[in-house]
Design a protein with these regions (language model features):
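Basic, glycine/lysine-rich polyanion-binding surfaces/domains
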Residues: 1-191
Length: 191
């Protein structure tokens, strides 16, 4: 029997004082751990994902359907279309040495909120000490931090010439709480 799951909030894209918020459609999320200094590991990952794992902090790389985020020196998050996740996990398991690596399906415990608009960083600054606008100034960069006592992965989706777009990867159990805070915080963005 296969488990199934759905979005947590089931909300459509809504605009709140210049910031749109939506819960992204479900996607596959695979946590990979291994040594970036292990050439065989890096080669095998590359052959399965058709991408080279980023080894620089706060970097995201992507191709058609797959996105890889650097989480730490020996840890990455791979985001895939939901319908391709199981096949990718199977291929990774067949190529990687299980004694030196770990592959974990984390799709069921994470959801993604997308924030877009010119006031996104103003809204987030109400809840963070860190200056996300500075931290995420590079196109398609990532940052992990604690957001109102909740660990969140922030991903910048836009280039300099595009509207600000951030994805917030967070635990499903915190989604409603964070969403309500963001909606409430958006009521006065004239800082």
């Amino acid at each position: 029997m296969s488990l199934s799951y759905s979005n947590v909030l089931n909300i459509n894209k809504k605009n709140y004082n210049g910031v749109t918020i939506e819960e992204k459609a479900l996607s596959g999320k695979i946590n990979i751990r291994g040594k970036s200094s292990d050439k065989e590991f890096m080669k095998n990952i590359g052959s399965v994902l058709n991408l080279v794992l980023p080894i620089e902090p706060n970097v995201r790389i992507f191709n058609n359907n797959i996105s890889i985020m650097w989480l730490g020196p020996n840890e990455w998050l791979v985001e895939t279309p939901e319908n391709e996740k199981d096949e990718i996990i199977s291929l990774l398991e067949s190529k990687l040495n299980p004694e030196k690596t770990a592959i974990t399906d984390v799709s069921f415990n994470k959801t993604v909120l997308r924030l877009e608009g010119e006031k996104v960083f103003i809204l987030l600054s109400k809840f963070l000490v860190a200056n996300l606008e500075k931290i995420l100034e590079t196109n398609f960069s990532v940052a992990q931090t604690i957001f109102i006592k909740i660990p969140i992965l922030f991903i910048r989706n836009n280039t300099d010439k595009e509207e600000i777009s951030l994805d917030l990867h967070l635990n499903r159990s915190h989604a409603k709480y964070v969403y309500d805070l963001l909606v409430d915080g958006s009521k006065n963005l004239n800082i």
